[in-house]
Each structure stands twice: as structure tokens, then as C-alpha cells.
Amino acid sequence: MRDQWICLALVLCALHSACGLYFHISETERKCFIEEVPDETTVIVNYKVELYDPRSNGFMPSSPGIGMHVEVRDSDDKVILSRVYSSQGRMSFTSHTPGEHVICMYSNSTAWFNGAQLRVHLDIQVGEHAIDYANVAQKEKLTELQLRIRQLLDQVEQITKEQNYQRYREERFRHTSESTNSRVLWWSLAQTVVLVCMGFWQMRHLKSFFEAKKLV
């Protein structure tokens, strides 16, 4: 049992580790990412925008006029965050429904910079990885042992949320499977009824034809 909990903790650590990447977009392009998040879980997004400089053939810190419009939608397609940020920043939101959350980003630049190439560095942190424990320890004046206990409690809480989310996904999958099986069954029955009716109609038609020709 203890080994199972250790394996589960390792898997969750891998799933909720920081997701650091960068991508290239034009200033009129919209880029979206999907993050599966349990309910009541904090998500922190760090980003930095760089502007392509043709003179140096590289990316430089973007101009002050270039920022990023960030929009976040939950699994019910409800907008939970929509705001314009500067070219470098940090944003956070808390999920209230489990499921896929869509994070979309696009530039708010004016026509002066239209057509330029941007490089966006993105770092998404979910769950306990979104907590700055150094700041927590300093703010609450925690000892090293107290801080470690706090981290363990947060990890246990995150594991519980993840388990609840997995059960939620299993229930949705089971409901979808049952609904699909039911539709397949009714469709098969409908096809059978149609075939029987067509066969009966053809037999009646042939019988009438033979009677008309006085073959029966």
C-alpha cells in the first residue's frame, strides 16, 4: 500500500511539474493551450514576449506598446479570465470546475507593429507547484520543519483533488460509453425493424404480382 502511494505521488509530480516552453506567433495570431485541472486548484502562468529584430536576426525584449491579451475558459466554456497584460508578467486563476481549461494568448499590438514575429516564453504551474513556499515561509515565519509539513499537507490535498478528478473523468467516460452503447442498440433495432418491414412488403408485392399473373 505504501509503495502504491509513493508511485502515485511520483506520477502526480510528473503531471503537475512546471511546463516551460516557447513558441513563435505573428502579432495577429491566436495561440491556445489546454490544461487539465482539478477543481479548486490554483494555476499560475508566467510569460515573456520578445520581438524579432531583423537587424540582429534575433529576438529582443519587446516594445512597451506590445502586450498580451490572455483569455481563460473552463470546461463549461465559461470565461474566467480575460485581461490585457504587459509584455512580461505573471497571472493566476483558480479553477472552480474540474476538466480542461483553455488558455488563449494573442498580441494587443497596434497596426504600427502589425506583421512582426513574436517569441513567447510560457511557464504554466499547476497545484502545489504554483505556490511560492519561500514567500510563504517568510510571510508566516515558518521554520524549516513547519514549511516541510506545510508542503506535505499541500501535496496530500493535491493528491486528493487529483483522485477526485480521475473519478470524475471515469464517471463521464462511463456515462459516454453507456450512452453510445444505448444509441448503437437502438440503431441496430431500428435497422432490424426496417429490414423486416421491407421483407414483408416485398413478399406481399411478389404475392400480388403472382396472383395478377395467375401463377399462384
Curated annotation (Swiss-Prot):
Residues 134-164 form a coiled coil. It comes from the Eukaryota. The chain crosses the membrane at residues 184-203. The keyword Membrane applies. Residues 1-20 form the signal peptide. The gene is eca. Eca and bai are essential, though not redundant, for dorsoventral patterning of the embryo. Specifically required during early embryogenesis for the activity of maternal tkv, while the zygotic tkv is not affected. PANTHER family: TRANSMEMBRANE EMP24 DOMAIN-CONTAINING PROTEIN (PTHR22811). The keyword Ligase does not apply. One of its GO terms (cellular component) is endoplasmic reticulum membrane. GO terms for biological process: dorsal/ventral pattern formation. Belongs to the EMP24/GP25L family. A motif (Prevents secretion from ER) lies at residues 213-216. It is found in: Endoplasmic reticulum membrane. Residues 30-126 form the GOLD domain. It comes from Drosophila mojavensis. Residues 204-216 are cytoplasmic. It is a single-pass type I membrane protein. Keywords: Coiled coil, Developmental protein, Endoplasmic reticulum, Membrane, Signal, Transmembrane, Transmembrane helix. This is Transmembrane emp24 domain-containing protein eca. Residues 21-183 are lumenal. Its main location: endoplasmic reticulum.
